[in-house]
Amino acid sequence: EYRRQRQMCIRDRNMPLAYHHHMGTIIETEEDTSRLIENTKDTVKLLVDTGHMLFAQGDSIKLVENFYDRIIHVHCKDIRKDILEQSLKNDATFRQAFLDGAFTVPGDGCIDYIPFLNALKKKNYSGWLVVEAEQDPAKANPFEYAKIGFNYLSKTAKQCGFEIIN
């Protein structure tokens, strides 16, 4: 009954439902995400998270190319490559990798956002690009890192032809 009520609420308000692939959940990898999208109705949309996709050793650009019509939201998160590699080598849990500082904001990690943003622009994406990073605030000042991420993503998105509205 609860599920039916939520579905009606979403439908009545014309709110799209987006699935967020995420480490530590049932849908983590590029393959998991593809299977989900291929086996659900078009009403189920997709939130692409660049950091979680790279952590799962997947390709966010392929998600854009294959499922653009389902993408309605993007989380731009970066990865500290050395910590990710160490976490994978040690078969660390997602939680441990997070605590070790694997994630950071765009511009402070190893993701080259130009090809990703160009893929979105090529498909005329006009939704949100959200700066995000799961970090320990005692190690990474949230305000300072938010500025780093916003400045980098704004500059890079403009280079790729996006109009930035803040």
Language model region names:
Residues 1-10:
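Single conserved hydrophobic/aromatic residue that forms the stacking wall/gate
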Residues 3-4, 18-24, 103-104:
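Surface-exposed cleft-lining segments at the edges of enzyme active sites
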Residues 9, 24, 79:
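Alpha-helical and His/Cys-centered functional microenvironments
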Residues 13-40:
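Basic- and aromatic-lined ligand-binding clefts that recognize polyanionic substrates
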Residues 14-17, 45-46, 54:
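Short N-terminal helix-initiation segments at or just after the protein's N-terminus
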Residues 25, 53-54:
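Catalytic P-loop NTPase motifs of RecA-like helicase/translocase cores
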Residues 30-44, 54-166:
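Histidine-acidic metal/acid-base catalytic patches
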Residues 49:
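Active-site glycine-centered loops adjacent to acidic/histidine catalytic or metal-binding residues
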